[in-house]
Amino acid sequence: MEREEIVSFLDEYLSISSYPDKSSNGLQVEGKEEVERIAFAVDACLDTIAKARAFNADMLIVHHGIIWGGVSYVKGLFAKRLKALLSSEMNLYVAHIPLDVHPEVGNNVQLLKLLNLEPLEPFGEYKGIKIGYIGEFEEPKPLPMIAQILAEKLPVDYVRSYEFGLQEIKRVAVVSGAGGFAIEEASEKADLLITGEISHADYRTAEDLRVSVIAAGHYATETLGVKALMKLVREKFGVKTIFIDSPTGL
């Protein structure tokens, strides 16, 4: 399969150029023209690159790439990561915000699906766009039950539940990864915010606004879109794929 055919499909399907994002979405590193084996991971780090090489991957598709806000110098850790990719002629394709917001394979839609919810409306204002969604249960569910479902379905050792608001939850807002910025909006539009992680300051914001938050793991909540995209690419192009798990515990 030609690289450009895969890249063109991903660029269009994920609307790569439609979002303001410093993470240089799309093909970050150009490698082999022919692609038969594709590795998928959350992060492009030395661990996942090495495991992709062991799989003999022609392309690595990730949520977090190696370029953030442009390149000034090619040295240090950046040089090591780049060398690891170039030495094996491995393509690196990145979908950061585009994979958060996508209405079919996106992290946030997939997070709602774990709770058997459908996206009702966009949520989570970030640089002028909504990157998350709101879903709604037909009948209210106990907050501990929701936390337990996520703990069972996500690749995470535990979830943190900050029970500052309602115990019976009907409207759920989701923002994968670091979604603390959406706490204020959640206090106005939902009974619960589900995200990956929050900061110390975010904790106090949620406490003062009396809104409950579940932090289910930054890494764990962002495996969902990558895995959904992997399934789509495998079925569409008939390539061999692998998901490389490299958890951070965060």
From Swiss-Prot:
Molecular function (Gene Ontology), one example: metal ion binding
Pfam family, one: DUF34_NIF3
Transmembrane feature ranges: none
Record: residues binding a divalent metal cation 1: H63, D100, E222
One GO cellular component term noted in the UniProt record for this chain: cytoplasm
Keywords carried by this UniProt record: Metal-binding
Superkingdom of the source species: Archaea
InterPro entries per UniProt: DUF34/NIF3 (IPR002678), DUF34/NIF3_sf (IPR036069)
Positions with a binding annotation for a divalent metal cation 2: H64, H218, E222
Family per similarity comment: Belongs to the GTP cyclohydrolase I type 2/NIF3 family.
Subunit structure and binding partners: Homohexamer.
Protein name per UniProt: GTP cyclohydrolase 1 type 2 homolog
Native organism: Pyrococcus abyssi (strain GE5 / Orsay)
